[in-house]
Amino acid sequence: MELPLFAILQRTPRVAITLAFVLFVLTIVPALYTLLADPILPPSISSFETDHTRLSHLNSSSNQIPSPVNGSIPTPPYHTPSKHRKSSFHRIPKPKKGPISSPTDHIPLRQRSSSFDQIPSPMNSPVPAPPHRNSSADQSPSPVNGPIPAPLNHTSLRHLNSSSDDHSSPVTTSPSRTRIRDDEQMCDLFTGEWVPNEEAPYYTNTTCWAIHEHQNCMKYGRPDTGFMRWRWKPESCDLPIFDPQEFLEMVRGKAMGFVGDSISRNQVQSLLCLLSRVEYPEDISPSPDTDFKVWNYTSYNFTLHVMWSPFLVKATKPDPKSNFFSLYLDEYDTKWTSQLDQLDYLVISSGHWFSRPVIFYENQQISGCQYCALPNTTELPLTYGYRKALRISLKAIIENFKGLAFLRSFSPQHFEGGAWNEGGDCVRTQPYRRNETIPEADLKVHDIQREEFRAAEEDGMKKSGLRLKLMDTTQAMLLRPDGHPGRYGHLQNPNVTLRNDCIHWCLPGPIDTLNDILLQMMKTDN
């Protein structure tokens, strides 16, 4: 008689126990083996151990990461953790291959293609407190190469649609992620707004040797740093931040010249500072004359010429008995025009010196004067001399230059509360908004530049195929009353009255943007 299996097990307990043990072994042992071979841990613990293991490995290699303060692992503020990870610990990005060598005391070059390579902010170091100074408004730095030029026919700012205190900041886009595409070459670079840029500045007064004393605002105690943290944002595109390696590759084996006054030299100092993150130049100037300098970047065989010509045309300094400059409005200043055949790029600018007392000569005869009050001499306006001088200078470029030329427009001054010699100062700490306008005299000089440029551009294309471009930066710089040295271009001395400098620009500062625009225009031309 056959019995069911459960009946057999009831009668023979030992068989039941043995069978149960076999089933237990066959079920549990494989599971234990899987668990021991590949443990399943909570995601946060797994992520922590992965990052911790990587950090331990890096610390044991030759490329050690400096130990963080208090033994904590810093979270890079610029790194966004992977959306697939649930850990709060951020991976440290791998270094890029082939970093650009830079001077050891300089900020390394920022690779704009990645959001990882943000330049450390030099503003983490304490800003020196301004020394004790007289509160008088008529202090100012000693100007470069002579007295600060007399003001243009300055009028107060005309407020169109808002007050000057409206400094609301628009939403900013990281300059490291935006570039002007090929199909945006016709973008108007010169109409736009200043937007915050927390990545700036890209050099400091301690890392760049080229900053002139009178533009070294932080050295002389300027208490605010916000003026360094803006970038120019055109309306219909984004302007890339200046890339020094890209610039040097573009000008490899070539020569560039800057012609003009101390604002032109101010821009050159900015360019030298921006390029110093890649290479220091060698001074190969043929003479000790500081008005004519030549630097060479040996790794790129690039030469940079700076030529002092504040009037652009032939001029003679006043004799001891006179305060009048003599301007020969129909004669070239051969100190720079004779160098044109050696250059591939040219940046020409001027304006401020034309507000000085001058006597005009044409055809070797006195044709008039400005601010002279001489008997039997026609008093002529500023616009007369400037138009004539700019016209003949552009003619010299058309006839003697075969490269790419830029006419940089007038850089405005921002005296408030009086003229340069009447206690005027520039104490604003934020940019103007675009709906605030400019002094009328600045508009006159700017209008002349635009008119003469159009005529020269047409003439140059007909005669020689000259590539002449207008770098119309007046609006951008007009909106930056906060960018001047003011009283912070010299030591503060309560016993000495010095005038404020509201003409030149602090370095680093807004004038760095001129080189952003210069590089972009060079790229567009190519």
From Swiss-Prot:
Main subcellular location: membrane
Single GO MF descriptor: O-acetyltransferase activity
Localisation: Membrane
Region (Disordered): 57-183
UniProt motif DCXHWCLPGXXDXWN motif: location: 501-515
Record keyword Transmembrane present: yes
Keyword Transmembrane helix: yes
Location of the motif GDS motif: 260-262
Compositionally biased tracts (Basic residues): 81-97
Keyword terms of this UniProt record: Membrane, Signal-anchor, Transmembrane, Transmembrane helix
Transmembrane segments: 15-35
UniProt topology in membrane: Single-pass type II membrane protein
Polar residues bias: start-end ranges: 57-73, 133-143, 153-163
Cellular component, GO annotation: membrane
Its biological purpose: May act as a bridging protein that binds pectin and other cell wall polysaccharides. Probably involved in maintaining esterification of pectins. May be involved in the specific O-acetylation of cell wall polymers.
The family this protein is said to belong to: Belongs to the PC-esterase family. TBL subfamily.
Further facts: Contains 2 motifs that are conserved in esterases, but it is unlikely that this protein belongs to the catalytically active pectin esterases.
Name of the protein this chain belongs to: Protein trichome birefringence-like 21
Species in which this protein is naturally found: Arabidopsis thaliana (Mouse-ear cress)
Gene: TBL21
